[in-house]
Amino acid sequence: METVAAAGYAHGAATRSPACCAAMSFSQSYRPKAARPATSFYGESLRANTARTSFPAGRQSKAASRAALTTRCAIGDSLEEFLTKATPDKNLIRLLICMGEAMRTIAFKVRTASCGGTACVNSFGDEQLAVDMLADKLLFEALEYSHVCKYACSEEVPELQDMGGPVEGGFSVAFDPLDGSSIVDTNFTVGTIFGVWPGDKLTGVTGGDQVAAAMGIYGPRTTFVVALKDCPGTHEFLLLDEGKWQHVKDTTSIGEGKMFSPGNLRATFDNPDYDKLVNYYVKEKYTLRYTGGMVPDVNQIIVKEKGIFTNVTSPTAKAKLRLLFEVAPLGFLIEKAGGHSSDGKQSVLDKVISVLDERTQVAYGSKNEIIRFEETLYGSSRLAASATVGATA
């Protein structure tokens, strides 16, 4: 199925060819709940490969899922090879490959965006769009043309959009199309976040109900970090020059180490417990690694296999991070990697998503760091019984 790459934007040397750029065909603007255009940037080859009858509906049995994991996923595998070994659910494979194609195009559009006084823009067909809106449209198109997504919503379009896929054997997807879009002009790393839930529900569910989550990281390297419910670990794929996603790392444990990323520091003004926590990091000579982008700040915990990210609220610094679009998917990635997440009292994967725009504070990191986070903010930790707080450099 990697052959569908030809229908997307060929990466590497081909992407730098003016002729290739001119030949690129995009659809009209994505129009939720309206008639869809006859063509897409995916082209007819992807349309042909994603016919609704391509894969049988229905969830795999637990026995089949376990059997699929007997074949070890290997470093060096392509995305398709990895997914074929990681899950027997062909619908989920198709959805993740389509999202990978969209993120490859987003990476190119971010890299070539024109940044003026108010926004960074690039072309989408005949339109000039802010790059976050362009990413939003590309991801909605990817989900529509996967033919296995029932509902989708995004941080830019926080209402359920019917993608036309089945309920039984299909999925609902929530995504942040371009987290950190305000720092594109400064050339900082930005990214895409998405979570995949089975069926047609995105409320009344928890982050723990996800069957997969992923993030795309658009920085010096373009990477695609994926975790699946029935596959151990969190897995990183690198976008090669020829446009292929290659499996380059798996993470199954997050150890102790003195690295911190403190978000929403203005909350330390009137949240003395958060101020105490940040001062502890400084006093203990933790290494500060904070970019202002949630995706790279969380991704470094998975890559370095240590550290903590915090984003805490206060009476005057309210919660901004969205549970559905950002917090739960990233929590899934961290916990599948062997780390922990917390809203101060519980794992973010245990929080019921009551409304699409629900917001929360959060911390991600190693077990001991989450214990320290919970104990400092609330006096006790649900994790403390089985671990001793302490970090090593």
UniProtKB/Swiss-Prot annotation:
GO molecular function ontology, one term from the record: metal ion binding
Subcellular location: Plastid, Chloroplast
The protein's Enzyme Commission number: 3.1.3.37
Entry binding sites for Mg(2+) 2: 155, 176, 178
GO cellular component: chloroplast; cytoplasm
GO biological process: fructose 1,6-bisphosphate metabolic process; fructose 6-phosphate metabolic process; fructose metabolic process; gluconeogenesis; reductive pentose-phosphate cycle
Assigned protein family: Belongs to the FBPase class 1 family.
Needed cofactors: Mg(2+)
Pfam family, one: FBPase
Annotated binding of Mg(2+) 1, by residue: 126, 155
Cross-referenced CDD domains: FBPase
Cofactor binding note: Binds 3 Mg(2+) ions per subunit.
Reaction(s) the record says it catalyses: D-sedoheptulose 1,7-bisphosphate + H2O = D-sedoheptulose 7-phosphate + phosphate
Protein name per Swiss-Prot or TrEMBL: Sedoheptulose-1,7-bisphosphatase, chloroplastic
Cystine pairings recorded for this chain: 115-120
Subunit: Homodimer.
Top-level taxon of origin: Eukaryota
Pathway noted in the entry: Carbohydrate biosynthesis; Calvin cycle
Induction: Light activation through pH changes, Mg(2+) levels and also by light-modulated reduction of essential disulfide groups via the ferredoxin-thioredoxin f system. In etiolated seedlings, induction occurs only after 4 hours of illumination.
InterPro entries per record: FBPase_C_dom, FBPase_class-1, FBPase_N, Fructose_bisphosphatase_AS, SBPase
Chain residues that bind Mg(2+) 3: 176, 179, 326
